[in-house]
Amino acid sequence: MIMGNLELFLIAVGLSMDAFAVAISKGLSMRRMSYKTALITGLFFGGFQALMPLIGFLLGTRFESYITAIDHWIAFILLSLIGLNMIKESRGPCEIIEDRFNLKDMIILSLATSIDALAVGITFAFLHVDIVPAVSMIGVTTFLFSFLGVKIGNVFGECYKARAELAGGVILILMGLKILLEHLGFLG
């Protein structure tokens, strides 16, 4: 399946919303906005968000022959579960991200916000998505959202965090539904 740039961009935006929400929290915890912190946050989150779908893609291509008959269902289920979880998290209590900025914390936060990208990478393998442009778009989009999230969190505060996760969840569910409907022949 050829996935267009718009579809890849929408998936990239959906995936970047967890990182965006955490970046907003980082910005909230800062007394004064630091562009260095925003840049490092964007690089960590964008880098991990690009790496994880690549790993998922490599795993998916390895096992593709075993599950080709149900790949569209797997894509639909994975994207929907990720999306539903993001929507659920958008309605829950706010997590406080401490104003700590060290390598260990950044790696943990980067992994936590990019686990769903691993599952998306697996679906990319089943859909034969050209992985280099896909991970590039995901990484750059997440970098930009994370960089801006630190600034937005520092300036505006908590009100955007839940909305970002809700929007990201809805986008991923819609993309999963689109993939399923295409494979079932309901969409051209």
From Swiss-Prot:
Keywords: Cell membrane, Ion transport, Manganese, Membrane, Transmembrane, Transmembrane helix, Transport. GO terms for molecular function: manganese ion transmembrane transporter activity. The chain crosses the membrane at residues 2-22, 39-59, 67-87, 107-127, 129-149, 166-186. It comes from the Bacteria. Pfam families: Mntp. It is a multi-pass membrane protein. It is found in: Cell membrane. GO terms for cellular component: plasma membrane. The keyword Disulfide bond does not apply. InterPro entries: Mntp/YtaF, Put_MntP. HAMAP family: MntP_pump. Belongs to the MntP (TC 9.B.29) family. Probably functions as a manganese efflux pump. This is Putative manganese efflux pump MntP.
